[in-house]
Every structure is written in C-alpha cells, then in structure tokens.
Amino acid sequence: MEVLLGITGKDFTIIAASKAAMRGATILKASDDKTRSLNKHTLMAFSGEAGDTVQFAEYTQANAQLYSMRNGTDLSPSALANFVRGELATSLRSRKPYNVNLLLGGVDPITHKPSLYWLDYLASLAKVPYAAHGYAQYYCLSILDKHHHPDITLHQGIKLLNLCTDELKRRLPIDFKGMTVKAVTKDGIIDIEFDDDKVVKMA
C-alpha cells in the first residue's frame, strides 16, 4: 500500500514517500517518515514488511556513518547503492530474508551529478532517471516517462511530482495521508513543503 517516488534533475534528486503506515486496510499512523539520510548527500526511502523496513534502514544508516567515521570521508550514492544491494543479496540467501523495497538517491560530492537507484527485495539494482515503488508504479511511470527530461529544475521536478500525486489521489481508492518530500542537492538534504490538502477533481 505504500507509495515511493523518485525523480532526478539537472542538479538534484527528489525522493517522496507516503505518510501512511498501514497494515492491510488499517492505517496505524498518519505521519510516518519512510526515509533515512545515510550521509550528507544520500537519502534512502523504503517500503515493505513493517519490521524489516526500519531495521534494515537503520542498519544501512549505521554502516554508512561508521564508514564515514573510520575513513573521514562519505561513501558516494553509487557505493552505498552497491553496498545495500550486497546486503540484500546476502539476506536473500538466509533463512529470514528482508522484505524491503528501496529508492536510494543522492548527489555525488565530487562530480555534483545526481543519481537515483531502484532496489527491490530480490536484490535487483538499477540506476534510473525516475522511479516508483508500490501502487505508484501503475499510475505514475507513464506520467514520468512523458514529462521527465534530464535538465529539469527543482521547481519543475516538484511540479512533476504534483502531477503524480494528483493522479494517485484521482485513481487510488486508498488515502495514503500525503507525502514526505525531500530533495538532495550538492549542499545537502532539504525538506520540501508539499501541499497534502489539495483536493483533486475526478476526471
């Protein structure tokens, strides 16, 4: 039931996650933050089995910060994506694999180029210009495919995200309680104010 969306642009990566923490058809929490900052320029959003998601996200966050403390430098988004993929692949071959789907995005601290990685519970890893997990895949990928281009600005990226969330409100029969939206730029991670109360008319 969770919604994850990611968009890259000229010099930024936007990651958005639905606020509703759900179990079946029941909403347990209406202000759940499904994102974790791994370092100053890398952000991860997660969905999946309730216990697995938070445990795996915090494990990844702790390992990223441990590396930074030991080596005096942060891992790049690409290095972190491959580390996460390796951990998921190892977990997949254990008796109790993590059931976690992830979007990992950031801006390289050296080249200042944005990147976004799509990972699923089977340890698949793909570098993509935009991505979605959950029900958002069915409704938003066509919109992103039509309107996205590599040189969009942050303002245009937020407008594109609005198009996606409007479509979800119009088509999905569930209330995902709005979105937590964050952007990663060369200056770090910033919270984006997002209008969750916008009423969308049916087509």
Curated annotation (Swiss-Prot):
Keywords for the protein's UniProt record, in alphabetical order: Cytoplasm, Nucleus, Proteasome
Assembly with partners or alone: The 26S proteasome consists of a 20S proteasome core and two 19S regulatory subunits. The 20S proteasome core is composed of 28 subunits that are arranged in four stacked rings, resulting in a barrel-shaped structure. The two end rings are each formed by seven alpha subunits, and the two central rings are each formed by seven beta subunits. The catalytic chamber with the active sites is on the inside of the barrel.
Any Gene Ontology CC annotation: nucleus
Official protein name in the record: Probable proteasome subunit beta type-4
GO terms for biological process, alphabetical: proteasomal ubiquitin-independent protein catabolic process; proteasome-mediated ubiquitin-dependent protein catabolic process
Localization of this protein: Cytoplasm; Nucleus
Gene Ontology MF annotations: endopeptidase activator activity
Native source organism of the sequence: Neurospora crassa (strain ATCC 24698 / 74-OR23-1A / CBS 708.71 / DSM 1257 / FGSC 987)
Similarity comment: family membership: Belongs to the peptidase T1B family.
Function: Non-catalytic component of the proteasome, a multicatalytic proteinase complex which is characterized by its ability to cleave peptides with Arg, Phe, Tyr, Leu, and Glu adjacent to the leaving group at neutral or slightly basic pH. The proteasome has an ATP-dependent proteolytic activity.
InterPro entries reported in the protein's UniProt record: Ntn_hydrolases_N (IPR029055), Proteasome_alpha (IPR050115), Proteasome_beta2 (IPR035206), Proteasome_bsu_CS (IPR016050), Proteasome_sua/b (IPR001353), Proteasome_suB-type (IPR023333)
